[in-house]
Amino acid sequence: MSIYSMSKSALDMFTKCLALELGPKGIRVNVVNPSGVRTDFSQAMGVDKDSVNSLLEVTGSSYPLGRIGEPIDIANAVLFLASDECSFVTAINFVADGGALWGAPPPKLR
């Protein structure tokens, strides 16, 4: 876990440093930090599809938006950051995680 966490932190700081260096040339630099996203990665590593789907459903249900991310969710975040509508944004960590960073929603009261 420490190597993974340090790698993510390094990419975040690298983004900020590049944004400072390249901003004067009109180049924007941002990073997208997704949470769990439904892909074929685990199956390619040999994990059976039912186990993957079960884990994704449990994980997604703990997110405030109540679902796991889909590749299109991350693609849309990247598209937005690359668009003219986002032309004054640089050096940010765009968190596309369905609210996962903030934890599970509060339990429903009866």
Task: Show where each model-derived region lies.
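Short, flexible catalytic-loop segment of classical short-chain dehydrogenase/reductase
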Residues: 34-44
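Catalytic tyrosine of NAD(P)H-dependent dehydrogenase/reductases that use a Tyr as the general acid/base
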Residues: 4, 12
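A conserved structural motif in NAD(P)-dependent oxidoreductases
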Residues: 63-74
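A short C-terminal helix-loop "cap" of Rossmann-like NAD(P)-dependent dehydrogenase/epimerase domains
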Residues: 47-63
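Short C-terminal tail/terminal secondary-structure segment
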Residues: 78-79, 90-110
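Alpha-helical segment proximal to the catalytic Tyr-Lys
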Residues: 20-24, 87
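Rossmann-like NAD(H)/NADP(H) cofactor-binding core
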Residues: 25, 30, 92
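Active-site helix of classical SDR
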Residues: 7, 15
